[in-house]
UniProtKB/Swiss-Prot annotation:
The keyword Transcription applies. This is Mediator of RNA polymerase II transcription subunit 20. Keywords: Activator, Nucleus, Transcription, Transcription regulation. It comes from Debaryomyces hansenii (strain ATCC 36239 / CBS 767 / BCRC 21394 / JCM 1990 / NBRC 0083 / IGC 2968) (Yeast). One of its GO terms (biological process) is regulation of transcription by RNA polymerase II. One of its GO terms (cellular component) is mediator complex. Belongs to the Mediator complex subunit 20 family. Coiled coil: none annotated. It is found in: Nucleus. Component of the Mediator complex, a coactivator involved in the regulated transcription of nearly all RNA polymerase II-dependent genes. Mediator functions as a bridge to convey information from gene-specific regulatory proteins to the basal RNA polymerase II transcription machinery. Mediator is recruited to promoters by direct interactions with regulatory proteins and serves as a scaffold for the assembly of a functional preinitiation complex with RNA polymerase II and the general transcription factors.
Length: 236
């Protein structure tokens, strides 16, 4: 599936209720509630490589680390550095994933645990960065998504997630996350936008700041691309 994000910054309670009513009239399968945490970190300019320590006091390059922890990815955190390198971290052990409702898409293999090949963390990666890597990364923003709903349509080939976005407790808009099956064999950016235009028109989705960009159009990365879109849309 490919994804796109829309942020409606001028959404009002009336427009939000109206949009939910519109989707409900399409008789979707309700997949429950969800929330997310999106954090933005900037590199510590005083943390420089040893080989540069004799000639530089601070780093001349600014780098950014983004972490996305959606509740539907239990115990997992998507990370993106400088919008070009992505990874998904999990703190769920494989043998424990069966105990989680609906399971966990990502988990640490039992063999890794038995051989000590894990971080040994019980917390998500974004918490680890914030608590243990402060000398390297400084948190700039913590954006929250709350009150989210998940709608499944078109026999599961279309998923629409909605969420209210907050920064420091201040409402910043309505987020709409669209995930659709990509039937095109050509992974060009122009072709990726076509199915979303169809969805926007068919379901009368309000227009707003939108991103369907990907890290590499020739090699799609479902979660890396999603985190990239969050970094572009939730840039306050």
């Amino acid at each position: 599936m490919v994804s796109a994000l829309i942020l409606i910054q001028k959404a009002t309670p009336e427009t939000i209720v109206q949009f939910h009513d519109q989707l409900s009239n399409e008789l979707p399968t309700l997949k429950g509630k969800w929330s997310f945490s999106f954090k933005i970190f900037r590199n510590n300019p005083y943390s420089i490589a040893p080989e540069l320590a004799e000639t530089s006091v601070t780093s001349s390059e600014s780098k950014f680390l983004y972490t996305l922890a959606p509740s539907y990815l239990v115990g997992s955190c998507i990370s993106l550095i400088n919008k070009n390198s992505a990874c998904v971290f999990s703190n769920v052990i494989e043998e424990e994933s069966a105990e989680i409702s609906n399971g966990s898409e990502f988990s640490i293999p039992d063999s890794h645990l038995h051989q000590g090949a894990t971080t040994g963390l019980n917390d998500t990666f974004d918490f680890f960065v914030n608590q243990k890597m402060q000398s390297l990364w400084t948190q700039k923003q913590n954006i929250k998504g709350d009150g989210g709903q998940i709608y499944e349509l078109e026999n599961g080939s279309l998923i629409i997630r909605t969420s209210n976005v907050f920064l420091h407790g201040i409402f910043k808009g309505l987020l709409i996350q669209i995930e659709v099956e990509n039937e095109s064999s050509e992974h060009e950016t122009s072709s990726l936008s076509e199915p979303f235009e169809r969805v926007l028109s068919k379901y009368n989705i309000p227009r707003g700041k939108m991103s369907c960009n990907v890290l590499d159009s020739k090699l799609l990365d479902k979660y890396g691309d999603l985190c990239l879109q969050y970094s572009e849309i939730l840039n306050f």
